[in-house]
Amino acid sequence: MESHGSGLRRVLLLSFCVAGIWAAYIYQGILQETLSTKKFGEDGKRFEHLAFLNLAQNVICLVWSYIMIKLWSNGGSGGAPWWTYWSAGITNTIGPAMGIEALKYISYPAQVLAKSSKMIPVMLMGSLVYGIRYTLPEYLCTFLVAGGVSMFALLKTSSKTISKLAHPNAPLGYGLCFLNLAFDGFTNATQDSITARYPKTNAWDIMLGMNLWGTIYNMVYMFGLPHGSGFEAVQFCKQHPEAAWDILMYCLCGAVGQNFIFLTISRFGSLANTTITTTRKFVSIVVSSVLSGNPLSSKQWGCVSMVFGGLSYQIYLKWRKLQRMQKKKKA
């Protein structure tokens, strides 16, 4: 009876995590798409300063992580010093800026799909640079994802979707997304190196360090350089309060979503988190198609299914590998 109650609590907690991640990031996606395509006010101006979203997100997450550390930290030391994140902060500033800038050139569903193909640069780098040999099923996953994204990019986008874009340019948009993935790869590798050197580093320490440097770099880029558009972004928000509200909600969704991701990984592992976030991306495309008026053709839906079929198969392979490792430990 006790084990039944414990199992029920785990199911409820997992459901809570799924709902939290889906709600936070699906709504954040809606806001991101709104800010990149909507014409605000009577003058019908677009919010062209999308890099400002990254600065705002850094500031909110910096404050959020600091509060969480003060509330939940046990006061122990041994985590990575704040200055160790300076290099990861550079790539983590440039990568997301490219990803969000891509929304000027391609639709939100296209951006989500392109950014879902993270395994492609990882496997390319692994095989070409490090000589890693992958299994046939792993190559099959990559083929499905790469093929789906490529065919989606080559298919004709609806005129309604194109009319919403600030500067339609598919090659540039997809190029920015793949550069985003490349920079993300360097960021993840650097974070892994930091946590290996400082094992007592927790998720909040990483969030604080990354967003501290992200805030510094984005402040310099937006307000310190001659071509920086920080002041124009602030002025736009003053003239269009609804845009400022959307930006605030966008940032809060990111901070809350991180909370649920940390909770999911700590209680259920990274595989469960990968499954939840992958399905969330698929739902985000469906929501964008239905709510934001980005109609996809049957061929495009086939490409979407192909990509997420490959991602689902990858998750299954990871699950099988995890099961085999657990059996070896028991033996």
From Swiss-Prot:
UniProt superkingdom: Eukaryota
GO molecular function: antiporter activity; UDP-glucose transmembrane transporter activity
Keywords associated with the record: Antiport, Endoplasmic reticulum, Golgi apparatus, Membrane, Sugar transport, Transmembrane, Transmembrane helix, Transport
Gene, per the UniProt record: UTR3
Null allele phenotype: Lethal.
Organism this protein belongs to: Arabidopsis thaliana (Mouse-ear cress)
Name of protein: UDP-galactose/UDP-glucose transporter 3
InterPro entries given in the database record: SCL35B1-4/HUT1
Domain remarks in the Swiss-Prot or TrEMBL record: The di-lysine motif confers endoplasmic reticulum localization for type I membrane proteins.
Membrane topology designation: Multi-pass membrane protein
Cited function: Essential sugar transporter required for the transport of UDP-glucose from the cytoplasm into the Golgi and the endoplasmic reticulum. Essential for pollen development and involved in embryo sac progress.
Family: Belongs to the nucleotide-sugar transporter family. UDP-galactose:UMP antiporter (TC 2.A.7.11) subfamily.
